C-alpha cells in the first residue's frame, strides 16, 4: 500500500452537521476500501484562490492515508460525483 495525502473542499453553504457528515462519508469511502487513515485534519473555512463552482470560500479537510490504488480511485470517483465536495487534490507521498 502507498501513502497518500488527500485534501478536499466542501461547499460553504452547507449546515455544520452536513459538513461533518460529508467529512465522515469521505473517510468511510477510504476505510471501506481497505485504507488506513493515519492523520486527519479539519482546516475550517478558508477563502479560495479563485471561484470554484460559484463559491469563493470552502471548508478544507486533509487526510493522510495508506491505501491501495483501488481505494484512491474510488475516493476520486465519489468526490467527483458528490454534490457536497467542490474540489479534491490527491498527492502520493514518498517514503
Segments (PLM) and residue ranges:
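Structured, basic alpha/beta domains of bacterial-type, RNA-associated proteins
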Residues: 2-95
Amino acid at each position: 500500500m502507498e501513502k497518500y495525502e488527500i485534501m478536499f473542499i466542501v461547499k460553504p453553504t452547507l449546515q455544520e452537521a452536513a459538513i461533518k457528515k460529508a467529512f465522515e462519508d469521505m473517510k468511510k469511502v477510504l476505510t471501506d476500501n481497505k485504507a488506513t487513515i493515519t492523520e486527519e485534519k479539519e482546516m475550517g473555512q478558508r477563502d479560495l484562490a479563485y471561484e470554484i463552482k460559484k463559491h469563493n470560500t470552502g471548508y478544507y479537510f486533509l487526510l493522510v492515508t495508506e491505501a491501495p490504488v483501488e481505494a484512491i480511485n474510488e475516493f476520486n470517483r465519489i468526490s467527483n460525483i458528490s454534490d457536497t465536495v467542490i474540489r479534491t487534490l490527491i498527492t502520493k507521498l514518498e517514503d
